[in-house]
Regions:
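Active-site microenvironment for binding and transforming phosphate-containing groups
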Residues: 2-273
């Protein structure tokens, strides 16, 4: 876990929510999952850690990407284990061709150039891939609609979180009725950035780094954008885990200079009676 300017607000949010976020096992695959009492029980959101698979070397052990140089048979076994653990039907989850943008599509539009889904109860399971970027789930408090987005610094700059809120608004969900969870990602302790990127962000989310460069508080910036768009700040849960500073549990593209695996973060809304 890394310190950042958002830690005090993050800690208060977690205290208000009850139990702090944690990594817990589903069968043999550990997932980070939100634990706030206000997160709808009918919404399944979680990010797999790197533990519980069969891949070796820099991909050990639950790499889920076929595009990073890992053995194909190992990746397919890892995906089978993840589906079995989370009870995702064969053939799922629906995925995207992620492009670090702000486009959000429906669960029936898998494979498109996009970085988020908007879903309804009973839609197929959806997932985004990450290894430092933040997976963010936004769900109506009654579980009637939800969104899952992949958000790195470009997504934070371009407002993919508020874009998801707009898409939920098209379904009649007011922002004040949305709850959110931001999964493990790169934190300010490990996210030095150059002046060009720093200029894109409010100085409130830029912290000093030992390199002398400013460092980005990515989850803090995401949470602030959601709150500014109307999501109650007390109902935004942020993972304390930093992917780069926890090599035992998380892949990190930045820490490992690109030679690493990928996590999946999943979202599913249970069918309504």
């Amino acid at each position: 876990m890394c310190a950042s300017r958002g830690d005090e607000k993050r800690a208060k949010s977690l205290r208000d929510s009850g139990e702090p976020a944690r990594v817990s096992s589903v069968d043999t695959v550990p997932f980070w999952r939100p634990t706030a009492a206000w997160f709808p029980a009918t919404a399944w959101f979680g990010m797999a850690t790197r533990v519980g698979g069969v891949s070796a070397g820099p991909y050990a052990s639950l790499n889920l990407s076929l595009g990073v140089g890992d053995d194909e048979a190992a990746v397919r076994e890892n995906r089978r284990r993840l589906r079995a653990a989370a009870q995702v039907p064969e053939g799922g989850p629906v995925m995207l061709h992620q492009v670090h943008g702000r486009t959000i599509v429906g669960a029936d539009e898998g494979g498109r150039d996009a970085d988020g889904f908007v879903v309804s109860p009973g839609d197929p399971w959806v997932a985004v891939s990450a290894a430092d970027c933040a997976p963010v789930a936004l769900v109506a408090e009654d579980g009637s609609a939800g969104a899952l987005v992949h958000c790195g610094w470009r997504g934070a700059r371009d407002g993919i979180g508020p874009a998801a809120i707009e898409r939920l608004g098209e379904r009649g969900i007011r922002a004040e009725r949305i709850v959110a969870a931001i999964g493990p990602c790169l934190h300010a302790c490990c996210f030095p950035i150059g002046p060009e990127v720093a200029a894109e962000f409010d100085p409130a989310f830029l912290l000093p780094h030992p390199t002398g460069q400013p460092s980005l508080d990515l989850p803090g910036a995401i949470a602030a954008a959601l709150a500014a768009a109307g999501v109650p700040a007390a109902r935004i849960e942020m993972a304390e885990e930093c992917t780069a500073s926890d090599p035992a549990r998380f892949f990190s593209h930045r820490r490992d200079r690109g030679l690493t695996g990928r996590h999946w973060a999943l979202l599913h809304l249970a069918p309504r009676p």
